């Protein structure tokens, strides 16, 4: 069957907080002049959580939907936010909740921290890296060769206290090649050179950085240091919808601010093969090769350059998203050719299949999921 499009490896989201992604973009500005940096944003990530609107606009909407004390709709909410990724061609995503429910963690997108490809040696640390943090599981995993990736929020801000978190990493012997350093907005050439020396990785979320801090990571210095870079959206309160959307922000920043230091091929690698290599998944996904998992996205041909084609593509240009050989979303003609009538109408000529018989809540339809969440999000 001719897809009438271009086939790519599925996009990989290397940094998110998926359980917050039923919330809309958070409209705010620094609430204290003493916490405002020269770019008009916050000095560090520990300040904006104290904004008076953070709880009612970000935390409470998430808790009301997910928590068992309220609507207890974690299954519906997680399926919804994973579909937001899938319609943009994402096939794997980092940052799912730690509840570990089969109703969502083993279906739809690959949840990176869970068991995948015969192993689960991937660790995440979101909280502050304190000076007494030992991290023996990281050290032993690195020494044994079993560690696949360590996702670490670090140096998120613009002040010296943010930059100094990197010093703790070095002093505590935690600067390892499996590190996926998330944000790093405070880092300079000095730190990126050290990260590059060990073969470390950077996860860049330009939109969230710009909205929260007024500027973003020095990816030019990271590139010069040989650091492998991935692009990811962070979360919906201050980030974009998916890597496909974040790719456009990164491309605009590269063109307008950096002087086009990344070519189109390099940009596309940041959402496909770079993430796969950064967590030792490259023998399974990230490129299209015989024997690899069939995590694929088909995009309409809107540009003759296949790499620019992805950068310019929007959700409606996604003709098909396949995860592990299973078609999940796409144009109705392709979904019908591959699945018969086993799908739901998703509007705009698209089809979606979120049902997985054999897992908890696997019979929930897309119509039911949306209806439940619309009711819950009224906050009556």
Predicted regions and their residues:
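Charged catalytic cores and adjacent phosphate/nucleic-acid-binding surfaces used
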Residues: 191, 198-200, 226-227, 255-261, ...
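Conserved, mostly hydrophobic/aromatic
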Residues: 85, 195, 202, 247, ...
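Active-site metal-binding motif and surrounding structural segment of the metallo-beta-lactamase
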Residues: 1-8
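His/Asp/Glu-enriched, well-ordered alpha-helical/loop segment
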Residues: 172-178, 215-303, 312-327
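Hydrophobic/aromatic ligand-binding patch that stacks against planar heteroaromatic rings
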Residues: 10, 84, 194, 221, ...
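Active-site core of metal-dependent hydrolases
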Residues: 95-240, 256
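Histidine-centered catalytic micro-motifs
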Residues: 10-23, 149-157
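Active-site microenvironment of metallo-dependent hydrolases
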Residues: 16-40, 44-127, 139-143, 269-380
